[in-house]
Amino acid sequence: MKKRLVYLFSVVFFVFLGLLQLGLKPQKVEAAYGILHPYSTPVATRGNWYYLDRDSKGTQKIYTVKITAHAVDKDKLYVPSQKYFEKHVYNASEKKRNQFIEKTKNIYAGYNYKKGFNVNNWVSLAGDGVYYIPVTRKVKGKKVKALHIATGAGPYTAAYAYKTKKLARLAK
């Protein structure tokens, strides 16, 4: 009888531990914030791109943009669920919406745009994000692949990036 009681207690204890472990697993971010799945960037835009711009002191400097399959400069991109946003964001109280915006300030949405894509805040309040569009440009009389980086509703050109630092310097 005593052995049976110890055995039963042991089984109940291990089942309890197993259930406790299931409950402690972190919830998926996808479900919490309306993420459908990771956004896949167009293949033509992937890689390291270099562009020439002025820094805060006014001197010209080469900047790098790294685009991978699902990220721009290590910022992961996701596709948002419109159903989730309609239910939990657009029709939520101002207080809840502001809390949601604060929680998701480091999550970015990716959208297809022409042959490129657009990156915007998870909940866009103003502006239209940054566009990355593959184009062909002439540098010193030769056609080369470039990345048109643009912002705003226009979209308005911010820079043209190239596959090498040398091309970025030559293009000016």
Q: Each PLM stretch: what is its role?
A:
Residues M1-A31:
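Sec-dependent N-terminal signal peptides of Gram-positive bacterial secreted proteins and lipoproteins
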